Amino acid sequence: MWFVFPQLIGLGHSAMAQRYAIRDLEQAKRYLADPILGGRLRDNVWRIIGHKGKTALDILGSPDDLKFRSCLTLFAEAASDSSDRMLFKEALNQFYNGTPDRRTLELLHSKPKL
């Protein structure tokens, strides 16, 4: 799950979560811009969206449904392309009533401690 739908560092605590975590918004932007990584992420989000009538919990199980929400939130914020932003927001709308992951937003927009 971590390398298919990465999330922001600070959300997961396992070794795998730390290994595959995205450090910041700039790294998320580079991830999206990479033809392989960004392409695979988009393809996989489209595949999940294709499961109409099911919840993220039905499709992914727990806690991966929460990780998916975190991933969508991160990349909706990172997307500079309107079609990318629409894709991630469409998935947030379909599975989470349009509500992004609060903790991801807090971590993204918090000021670094000095």
Language model features with spans:
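Hydrophobic/aromatic-rich, well-ordered segments within soluble, folded domains that form packed cores
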Residues: 1-25
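Phenylalanine-focused residue identity feature
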Residues: 3-5, 68, 75, 88, ...
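Short helix-capping/linker segments at secondary-structure and domain boundaries
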Residues: 10-16, 77-87
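C-terminal end-helix/capping segment
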Residues: 21-40, 102, 109
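Mid-chain, well-packed structural core segment of small domains
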Residues: 30-80
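Charged phosphate-binding loop/patch that engages nucleotide di/tri-phosphates or the phosphate backbone
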Residues: 80-114
